[in-house]
Design a protein with these regions (language model features):
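Alpha-helix termination/capping residues and helix-transition junctions
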Residues: 1, 51-52, 80, 138, ...
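Glycine-rich beta-alpha loop elements in corrinoid/cobalamin-binding modules
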Residues: 2-102
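Radical SAM [4Fe-4S] cluster-binding motif and immediate context
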Residues: 107-264
Length: 264
């Protein structure tokens, strides 16, 4: 029904093969520029353009710094090939522009505009409405793309800004259950406690979930989070084998994990 001028795909390793098939079909039918972004295409940007003829560009780094300015130039009919993080073909070669710097202050990013979505509630009641509360993880687990994509730099939006987003989406869509999108939400204990305090002061009840490492959370923090509406928490334990913990550079103290899980 629609004839888009650009089609972009957010890529992950677990579904990259599906994205490739979809992109191939879109290119064959519409002929519009195909752009890949996200962690999988970011890591293999050169290989993607060398091996996949129907992908025209790869945007590396944070979308606000790369995808947005490049898309804007394409829609103007004046592609800006100087955008940091852009990877493209030129005269048979692959050109990889310098990677953009990470956004220092995530509070400067505008709220996501969901008005173009269908009119029904843009949230999954089972997993929560996703809000980007921060980015990055300082740890170096060998299997994880986070350390490569975000550069092992931990960033968290301010408690005030996170609360403003909760209120905004609650007031606009009536949403009361949120998924706090961050690989390591509990890294900054003081900030997490302040976020929980602000949530408790809301005139209505909200619920939420998050992700954390088992060595960056304890019973006291769990109680504080639960009192502010925490419904469940995803703990990245990965393996119960001490040998495998070392091999993948996770290095958790496994003897502390089971008591914590039982408490949760």
């Amino acid at each position: 029904e629609k004839e888009p001028k650009i089609v972009s795909f957010y890529t992950r390793s677990d579904c990259y093969h599906i994205m490739l098939k979809m992109a191939q079909l879109v290119k064959a039918r519409l002929g519009c520029p195909i752009i890949f972004a996200g962690p999988q295409a970011d890591i293999i940007a050169r290989e993607t353009l060398e091996e996949i003829p129907f992908v025209d560009f790869v945007c590396c780094g944070e979308g606000e710094n790369t995808v947005y300015p490049f898309f804007s130039s394409l829609l103007r009919g004046e592609p800006d090939l100087s955008v940091y993080g852009l990877v493209y073909r030129k005269d048979g070669d692959i050109v990889m522009n310098p990677r953009p710097k990470l956004i220092e202050d995530l509070d400067t990013i505008p709220f996501v505009d969901y008005r173009i979505c269908p009119e029904d509630e843009p949230a999954n009641a089972q997993i929560g409405f996703p809000i980007d509360v921060g980015r990055g993880c300082p740890f170096g687990c060998t299997y994880c793309s986070t350390k490569t994509f975000w550069g092992r730099k931990y960033r968290l939006k301010s408690p005030k800004r996170i609360l403003e987003e909760l209120q905004h989406f609650h007031d606009m869509y009536g949403i009361s259950y949120f998924a706090f999108e961050h690989d390591m939400f509990t890294m900054n204990r003081a900030q997490v406690i302040e976020i929980c305090r602000l949530i408790r002061e809301l005139p209505y009840k909200v619920y939420w979930n998050c992700s954390a490492r088992s060595d960056c959370i304890d019973e006291e923090l769990i109680r504080i989070m639960a009192d502010s509406g925490l419904r469940w928490i995803y703990l990245g334990i990965e393996t119960g084998s001490p040998r495998m913990q070392k091999l993948v550079n996770k290095n958790l103290k496994l003897e502390t994990v089971l008591p914590l899980v039982k408490y949760i």
